[in-house]
Amino acid sequence: MKDYLIKATANNGKIRAYAVQSTNTIEEARRRQDTFATASAALGRTITITAMMGAMLKGDDSITTKVMGNGPLGAIVADADADGHVRGYVTNPHVDFDLNDKGKLDVARAVGTEGNISVIKDLGLKDFFTGETPIVSGEISEDFTYYYATSEQLPSAVGAGVLVNPDHTILAAGGFIVQVMPGAEEEVINELEDQIQAIPAISSLIREGKSPEEILTQLFGEECLTIHEKMPIEFRCKCSKDRLAQAIIGLGNDEIQAMIEEDQGAEATCHFCNEKYHFTEEELEDLKQ
């Protein structure tokens, strides 16, 4: 089944909700990044959440998220647009630990419990919207929940889960974001908190094969939920040889000349998809300004 995301409202429009099935998307990220199990879970959660954040945008807007903890993973970076295209990478993809005391992948140990979550939105304006909040747990979902409450003053619940097979491929992945709309009564916030506490962990729902529709129905009940849109999501990279050529130009003529003399060419690799682009001596000469 292809990955997809749904947009919905609940409680007479006082809550907006997003839910996503991202298994194939995360498997493609894992394949391109060659991530081990714990790294796959951390990267997968970040990409899953970022895909839903991208679905909140319009037109040509885009969003980039970065999880920078003090753990061995280093940086986790993901970006998404309003059309369901998402990509991501992690600095150290071969991080893997034994299961934690709850029997789950130890994402917090890999990410670290100190550091920052940063969000950059390109909304087509002169300046980007940027927000940054501290990591509160390293579990990623809780960290983005805190980001929304603190940076955007939007009471939210964020959940993302990734299940990994013994051979490191992705068994299942998905998540949800639910947000209380501005002006909603305090009782709506309290009711949402109770609803979140009442449902099983997102990883359990994913393991049971629950669809995005079923996840939100379990959360709000069928009568209170209105689904407005269903859209596909996929791992798609924006890299190209022309884009990487611009990056090489930015290094300056001296660096380009060194590539020509020492390496008789150059090979550039995209961080996000690991696609390799080769530049001959002649192509490098043409890039000199």
Swiss-Prot record:
GO terms, molecular function: protein folding chaperone; unfolded protein binding
Keywords, sorted A to Z: Chaperone, Cytoplasm, Disulfide bond, Redox-active center, Zinc
CDD domains cross-referenced by the UniProt entry: Hsp33
Keyword match Zinc: yes
Modifications the protein undergoes after translation, according to the UniProt entry: Under oxidizing conditions two disulfide bonds are formed involving the reactive cysteines. Under reducing conditions zinc is bound to the reactive cysteines and the protein is inactive.
Gene Ontology cellular component annotations, sorted alphabetically: cytoplasm
Homology family: Belongs to the HSP33 family.
Gene Ontology BP term (one): protein refolding
Annotated function: Redox regulated molecular chaperone. Protects both thermally unfolding and oxidatively damaged proteins from irreversible aggregation. Plays an important role in the bacterial defense system toward oxidative stress.
PANTHER family on file: 33 KDA CHAPERONIN
KW ATP-binding (keyword) present: no
Localization of this protein: Cytoplasm
InterPro entries: Heat_shock_Hsp33 (IPR000397), Heat_shock_Hsp33_C (IPR016154), Heat_shock_Hsp33_N (IPR016153)
SS bond list: C237-C239, C270-C273
Protein name: 33 kDa chaperonin
